[in-house]
C-alpha cells in the first residue's frame, strides 16, 4: 500500500483527512471514458460518469475513515487509484471497533441506494429517457455503479471489505489470529475463482485485480502465522495494552534502538527501576518513553500499560520519543 501512496499527489483535505490521487488514475480514466463515449452524444457525459464513480468511491472511503475515528482510532489519509480507494485507517485492535470501521464503507453505498433509485424513478416518470437521454443514461449508470461497488466490496474475499468483515465477526468467537487465518484461506479460494473468471472472460482487469488480492492474501497469511505464534507466548500479568487490552509477552521481545540489545521492556521498566514510566535498556541504560504493543502496533508508556492493567503507577506524563523496536 505504501507504493500506492508514493505515486499519489494531494488533492484536498477535509476533516483533517488528506485526499490524494494516484497518477495512474488518469490513464485508466482516459481509457474508460473512450469506451463509454459511444453511449453518449458528447464527451462531457462519460467524463461525468467517471467523476461520479470517483465521488462514490471517495464517499465510501470517508465512511471507513470517519467510523475509525469514532472508535478511537486514527485515520488521516485516503488515496484513490484505478482499483478503487484506500483509506489508511488504524482502528483499535478489537473486533467491535474493526467491524464498525469496515462496515461503515459499504453502509455509505447502502445509504445511496434509495437516493439513486428515487432519482432514476423520477427521471423515468418525467420522460427523461426521450427528452434528455444523456442525463437519464447517466442516472442509470451511476445507480448501477453504486450497486456493483456495494456487491463487489461485500464479497467475502480478503482483503475486500466483505472478507475483513468476515474476519471481524469470526474474531468474536475464535480470536484475532485464527479469524485472520480463516479469512485469508477463504480469500485464496476467492482468488482462484477470480482467476478462472478472468480466463473465461478474457479480462485483463479482473486478472490484475485477482493478482492484487493474491498478494494481500499472501501478506495476510504470513501475518496470521506470526499472530498464531505470538498467541502461544506466556504473558506478563499486571500490564495491558490500552488499545487491544492484550498483556505484553513475557521475555526479551524488544530491541534497543540505541545499542541493538534485546530486552524485556516491562522487566526493566517495572522491576529494576521501581516501576518507572519508561522502558530502560539494561545494556546501555537508554530510556524509551513509549513501548510498542507487539499485538496491535500502538505505542504507550509503561505507566499507560500499567494503568490499563489495573496497576497504579505514580509517574509524570512523558512525551513520545524514539521507542524500542520489536525483534523480528
PLM regions: where:
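Hydrophobic transmembrane alpha-helices and their immediate loop junctions
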Residues: 1-328
Amino acid at each position: 500500500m505504501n507504493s500506492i501512496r508514493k505515486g499519489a499527489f494531494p488533492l484536498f483535505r477535509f476533516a483533517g483527512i488528506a485526499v490524494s490521487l494516484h497518477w495512474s488514475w488518469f490513464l485508466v480514466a482516459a481509457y474508460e471514458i473512450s469506451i463509454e463515449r459511444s453511449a453518449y452524444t458528447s464527451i462531457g457525459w462519460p467524463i461525468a460518469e467517471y467523476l461520479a464513480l470517483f465521488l462514490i468511491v471517495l464517499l465510501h472511503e470517508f465512511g471507513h475513515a470517519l467510523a475509525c475515528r469514532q472508535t478511537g482510532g486514527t485515520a488521516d489519509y485516503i488515496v484513490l487509484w484505478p482499483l478503487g480507494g484506500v483509506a489508511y485507517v488504524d482502528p483499535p485492535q478489537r473486533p467491535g471497533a474493526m467491524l464498525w470501521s469496515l462496515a461503515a464503507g459499504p453502509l455509505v453505498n447502502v445509504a445511496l441506494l434509495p437516493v439513486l433509485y428515487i432519482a432514476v424513478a423520477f427521471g423515468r416518470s418525467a420522460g427523461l429517457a426521450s427528452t434528455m437521454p444523456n442525463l437519464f443514461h447517466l442516472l442509470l449508470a451511476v445507480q448501477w455503479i453504486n450497486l456493483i461497488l456495494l456487491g463487489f466490496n461485500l464479497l467475502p474475499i480478503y482483503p475486500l471489505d466483505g472478507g475483513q468483515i468476515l474476519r471481524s465477526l469470526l474474531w468474536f468467537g475464535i480470536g484475532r489470529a485464527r479469524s485472520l487465518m480463516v479469512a485469508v484461506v477463504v480469500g485464496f479460494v476467492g482468488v482462484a475463482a477470480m482467476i478462472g473468471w478472468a480466463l473465461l472472460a478474457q479480462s485483463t482487469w479482473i486478472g490484475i485485480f485477482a493478482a492484487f488480492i493474491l498478494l494481500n492474501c499472501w501478506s495476510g497469511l504470513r501475518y496470521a502465522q506470526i499472530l498464531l505464534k505470538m498467541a502461544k507466548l506466556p504473558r506478563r500479568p499486571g500490564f495491558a495494552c490500552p488499545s487491544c487490552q492484550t498483556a505484553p509477552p513475557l521475555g526479551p521481545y524488544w530491541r534497543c534502538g540505541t545499542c541493538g540489545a534485546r530486552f524485556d521492556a516491562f522487566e526493566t521498566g517495572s522491576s529494576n527501576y521501581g516501576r518507572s514510566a519508561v522502558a530502560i535498556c539494561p545494556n546501555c541504560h537508554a530510556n524509551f518513553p513509549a513501548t510498542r504493543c507487539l499485538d496491535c502496533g500502538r505505542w504507550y508508556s509503561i505507566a499507560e500499560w500499567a494503568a490499563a492493567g489495573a496497576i497504579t503507577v505514580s509517574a509524570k506524563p512523558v512525551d513520545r520519543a524514539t521507542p524500542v523496536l520489536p525483534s523480528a
